[in-house]
Amino acid sequence: SGGRAGRKLVAMTLLEQRGKAAGVGLGMFGGAVAMQNQVIDHQEYFYVDNYYLKLMIEMGYTGLAAFLITVLGFLANGCRALYRTAQQKKQGLSRLFPLCAGIFAGLCGVFVHCGFENIFEEPYMMAYFWSLAGLLMWAGFLREDKQEVRA
C-alpha cells in the first residue's frame, strides 16, 4: 500500500532490520535532513509524516523513551506552573495565569501535531517551542514575587 500507511510499514521494517534499541542514526531517516543529505547509496530515503515515528526509527526505542520522558516531565511541570500561577492570581499577586494557560495549551497542541507531521524538524519551531516552555517554567517556578516597598 502507499501513502502514509505504506511509509509507516517501510519505516517499521527498517527498524526491525537495523536494530530496535538504537535505530538507524540521526539524520538518516524520514525527514528533510535525510532527504537532502543522502549519504548511503544503498538506502532508500523518504519522508514519514509522524515525528514520533521518525524519532523512533532514527534513535530506536531508547531515544523515543528519552524524548517521551522529557515530554512527560514538561507536562507535569507545566501543570504545576499553571496551578501555582492560578493560586497567585486568586491571591492577587500575579496576573500571569491566562498567559501561562495559553502557552501550555499551545505547546500541548504542538505535541498532538507531531503525530501527523515532522513539526520539530523546522529549527524555528524547535526554538519557539522550547523558549515558550522555558518561559512557562520561569512564570511558575523561577519568577521572584513582588515585594512591598515601604518608605
State the predicted function of each range:
Residues 58-109:
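Hydrophobic transmembrane alpha-helices and their immediate junctions
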Residues 1-13, 17-59, 81-85:
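Long extracytoplasmic/lumenal interhelical loops at the membrane interface
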Residues 7-10, 51, 55, 61, ...:
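Generic recognition of well-ordered alpha-helical segments
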Residues 21-25, 64-66, 121:
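Extended hydrophobic-aromatic, low-complexity segments
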Residues 2, 14, 20, 74-81, ...:
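Hydrophobic membrane-targeting alpha-helices
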Residues 17, 35-39, 71, 117, ...:
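Short, well-ordered loop/turn and helix-capping segments at boundaries between secondary-structure elements
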